C-alpha cells in the first residue's frame, strides 16, 4: 500500500479556506467527480461554527484547485441542524445526483437525501427525496456513491444510537442499487478494532477501483473531529475491507482520491489548522505532478 496517494506526495494548494477561526469553522469533507470534458466537480461541506448554518457547496474547476461555486444548499432548506459530507455523481444518461447528509435537530440521528438535476446549478432547487433515512437505532452519514459498470455502489458511515453518550462510534456499510434510488443493504464492511488507534470507529472516505481504500479512524470519543487516515483493502469476502496498517498514515480526515485518466491522482482532504479550524486542500500526485514541479 506504499503507493497509495497520500497527502504530502505533491504540492498542497488550499482549494477552500477555513470559513472562520477556531473550532467548528470547517471547509472540507469533499466528494469529487471528473466530467468527460475534463472539468472537475467538487461538492463539499462548510460548517460556520458549531452553532452556525452548515452548507453543502457544489463547485466546478478547470484544475481541481480554483473552485467556482455553482450551487449552495444550507441546512435550513432540509430542516436540519447540521450537514456533513455529500457525494456527487452522474447518471448513465448524464444527469447529476447529489447525496446530502443532514443531522436531525436535538438528536444524534443523521439521514441522507438525494437530489437530481439536468445541470449542476439546478441542484440548488432540485427536489430532495429520501435515500438512506436511518432509524432510531442507527445514524447514517458521509456517503461515497459510485456508478460502476451500470451498477450503483454506496459506502455509508453508520453510528449506533443504542448507548447514550457513545453515538460517535462508527463503522462503514455497503449498499448496491440498479437505479441509484432503491438500495439493497449488505451491512458492515469495515469495523473498528478494539484496543487499537481506530477502536472507536472506521469511516471509509475513498474506495479505489483496484480495491484499495482510505478511512478515518479514532481511538476515543475525545478524538471526535480529530480523526486520522488509515488504509484498507478489499478482502476475499464480497464487499468487505480490512485494515492493512497498525497505525494511521497521515493526520488529516476525509481523504478524497480521484484517479486521473492519464495516470496519477488528484486528492482533496480536510486539514486542521493550529486554531482548530479546517481548510480543504488538494494535491496533484503522479506523472502530472512531476511535470508541474520540473524546472
Please name every model-derived segment.
Residues 1-295:
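Carbohydrate-active catalytic/glycan-binding domains of CAZyme proteins
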